[in-house]
């Protein structure tokens, strides 16, 4: 019997999301206008809490949908205006261009990145050295490329290798269901479990590597670009400004990588089984023999484009998004990708998040119009200048570990800039606060998948169920990194940021605008 109209509408609303989640959102949409009539300030904070809830529940439903409904209602009932939302979007156009074009541009360099990580995996036998190499490679790439893309490439490598061994273990040439272990005998299952543990640890090292590298440059994370623009910094300025905090954090993060592998803590330390290595090596040898001259030229061209990308960013030859567009044009032209649909695939990864970012800016507009963060900022600004840095870092860190970095970074840098423009803080203090905000937004956020977009991408990927990587296991494996990165970052903000920045100024390496 066909279901009723009401039941059909309920099923269509937010699709496969659980009923309790749908009900919660409906309650939010009913309650918000009523609270707004009584107290706009309370309603504003309620909206922020609801929006953070949708981000935290990203696995139940992509936040664009519920967050977008909340944002539309906020504009409709007068919490902010459509014009203010447009102004926020216009002010952050560079970030939208970064997400649209840079992420798509790197898509056309995936063959080179796959080649790099495959070589690393098969060339280095020491697990400690391999883990360190993955972490360093991910950090370096994330300093210039989008972290999501770097993680996507590592996922591609891992899924490919897992599939190769799974086919051998199941004795089937066509193994379409990688989650089906029923055809694998007991001996192979033991080896497969070890291989899963090995891949889990590598994926986590690579994921943390993207955070370590992403915090260092203005293109490493979308919020970095927002903060750099607000402070008026270019690529080199940003790197030097962050280095009093980010360089010690990078060193300690890499030492943590070695330590957890050596001591086999928190689920790390599993090595690549020799049987798996033999299978993968045979496959790689076969692939290399089949590689044509045309394939080799593609890799060389992509490497040259990579050099252009790094050079253009370092010398600030154009806006970041436009450099990304140049990468798309060069990579497609010189590697023979001419079909519109083939080019279109490059944009599927970035455009949903670009749309979500526009919704973020709607909520930011509400925060500004309702002056929601004014009490917090006033509390922080009442502290001494030295204490302000640590307080900004801590407040950013707490919110970033459960919410999205771009959202948090945008809110706090806007508030700090408003304080500077009103004369509450000096320009010099504002620049130090920008460093505290950026590092506070990026470093503690490795605590949960909600904080790091790259982690959330990994958790929701096809690889996660194959290697038994759940939300809880990811939080557990990230814990040593969370503690080290957060505490070292806080100590550096407290003790090294101001004196080292002062020394840089005396040396003439950086200047206050």
From Swiss-Prot:
Pfam families in UniProt = NhaB
**GO biological processes:** response to lithium ion
Q: For this UniProt entry, which segments traverse the membrane?
A: 23-43, 52-72, 97-117, 120-140, 144-164, 202-222, 238-258, 303-323, 348-368, 391-411, 447-467, 475-495
Molecular function (Gene Ontology), one example? sodium:proton antiporter activity
Q: Name one GO cellular component term.
A: plasma membrane
Enumerate the UniProt keywords alphabetically. Antiport, Cell inner membrane, Cell membrane, Ion transport, Membrane, Sodium, Sodium transport, Transmembrane, Transmembrane helix, Transport
UniProt note: phenotype after gene disruption:
At pH 6 and at low Na(+) concentrations, deletion mutant grows slower than the wild type and its Na(+) dependent transport of glutamate and proline is markedly inhibited. However, when grown on these substrates at higher pH (7.5), mutant does not show any specific phenotype. A mutant devoid of both nhaA and nhaB is extremely sensitive to Na(+) and Li(+) at all pH values, and membranes prepared from this strain show no Na(+)/H(+) antiporter activity.
Which locations, inside or outside the cell, does it occupy?
A: Cell inner membrane
Question: What coarse category fits the chief subcellular location reported for this protein?
Answer: membrane
Q: Does the keyword Magnesium apply?
A: no
Q: Does the keyword section mention Cell inner membrane? A: yes
- Membrane topology type: Multi-pass membrane protein
Activity regulation, free text: Activity is weakly pH-dependent.
Q: What else is known?
A: NhaB seems crucial when the level of NhaA activity is growth limiting, when nhaA is not sufficiently induced, and/or when NhaA is not activated.
Q: Write out the similarity annotation.
A: Belongs to the NhaB Na(+)/H(+) (TC 2.A.34) antiporter family.
**Function in brief:** Na(+)/H(+) antiporter that extrudes sodium in exchange for external protons. Catalyzes the exchange of 3 H(+) per 2 Na(+). Can also transport lithium. Essential for regulation of intracellular pH under alkaline conditions. Is necessary for growth on Na(+)/symport substrates such as glutamate and proline under conditions in which nhaA is not expressed, such as acidic pH and low Na(+) concentration.
What is this protein's record name?
Na(+)/H(+) antiporter NhaB
- Which species is this UniProt entry from? Escherichia coli (strain K12)
